[in-house]
Amino acid sequence: MKNIALISIFIFSHNSWSFEKLDALLDGLHQDAHEGKFESYFDRYSSDAVFLGTDKTERWTIEQFKSYAKPAFSDGHGWTYAVVERNWGGDGNTRWFDEILLNEKLGHCRGTGVVELINSEWKISHYALTMLVPNSIAAEVGSLTLEADK
């Protein structure tokens, strides 16, 4: 019985530690973006990461994303997304997440992605940012999108 209790404590403390590390990775990402810390922001991604932005043309390798982001970070202010909530899934060396974010210009957005444990360090290997559209205005937004695509 004592062994079961010790194993349970280890499992729960390990899971808690893992999620604290994972949350710190993403919280740090958003803080680095807010403060315009280019190097620290991109150090959180794996070398073969992919970033999907809100525009249909925005599917970038990490190097392409760096080129896009460099001007935004150059004045010490990247972009600001406040975390509203976050969920984690997966186990082992691969985890995935979804988070609701709030941006002053875009409103509520959703970030989804995958993180991997690489050389004992969690890295973001895939991140997708999407705008959240309330169902009550989805058709109107869809029409605007279709018109913009012409």
What label would you give each PLM region?
Residues 1-7:
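Sec-dependent signal peptide recognition
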Residues 8-43, 63, 93, 143-150:
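Short, low-complexity N-terminal intrinsically disordered segments enriched in polar/charged residues
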Residues 21-22, 64-108:
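Surface-exposed, charged secondary-structure patches
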Residues 41-42, 49, 65, 97, ...:
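Hydrophobic pocket/interface hotspot
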Residues 45, 55, 85, 99-103, ...:
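A mature extracytoplasmic/lumenal domain signature
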Residues 49-60, 71-77:
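A short gly/proline-enriched turn/hairpin at secondary-structure junctions
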Residues 88-94, 115-123:
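A short, structured loop/turn motif at beta-sheet edges
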Residues 118, 126-150:
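Low-complexity, intrinsically disordered terminal/linker segments enriched in charged
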